[in-house]
Amino acid sequence: MINTNKEELLIGLVSDTHVPTRTDKVPEVILKDFKDKNVDYVFHMGDFTSIDIYEQFIETFGKDKVFAVIGNMDAGSSELKDILPESLEFDLYGHKIFITHGTGGPSMIVRRLNKSHDLSKYDIIIFGHVHRPYNEVWRDGKLYLNPGTPTDKRFTDINSYGYLRISKDKVEPEIIHL
């Protein structure tokens, strides 16, 4: 699990890499940026579309540092279905975090997430699927965060990934546009 012995953590966020269906590889700039910033962990919100890409993240950052969920486009991979859960939850420095892929189109994604999951006990909801970066505290007081997609222009004209810097007193999300 996640070690919170440090004062704060820097978590790299990526989703919907869609390799090889949309592109031939994860953009090197993301892997380099995560390494250069010495991320503590990487969260991937699904749609690898290939076990090879999941394994690339494991090889690059280490099995104990990569946490991922299955996406709708991963369902065809029995290997990914066998190892990736539909959701993850963490308590980091007292902040309760829920991670899932998501379903449906971009409009009303927050409502759909709340209908398909009981999010009442979480402070931060991190999701993928809609390809659009999303960083918003909603009227329920929860942070909804989506790093977008680094490779696919469906539903968006911006490719992106992100970071979450978190400590007892701080929650700082950041979206990076490519």
Regions found by a protein language model. Give the residues of each.
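N-terminal active-site segment of His-dependent metallophosphoesterases
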Residues: 1-56, 77-83, 157-159
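Binuclear metal-dependent phosphoesterase catalytic core
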Residues: 2-8, 36, 89-93, 120-122, ...
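Active-site neighborhood of phospho(di)ester-bond hydrolases with catalytic His/Asp-centered motifs
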Residues: 13-15, 41-47, 66-72, 99-101, ...
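Active-site environment of divalent metal-dependent phosphoester hydrolases
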Residues: 18-22, 48-53, 73-79, 104-109, ...
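Short acidic, glycine/proline-enriched helix-loop-strand junctions
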Residues: 37, 58-69, 140-142
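A short acidic, amphipathic alpha-helical/loop segment
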Residues: 53-57, 112-115
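Helix-adjacent hinge/juxtasegments
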Residues: 63-107
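Internal catalytic-core helix/loop-beta-alpha segment
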Residues: 94-130
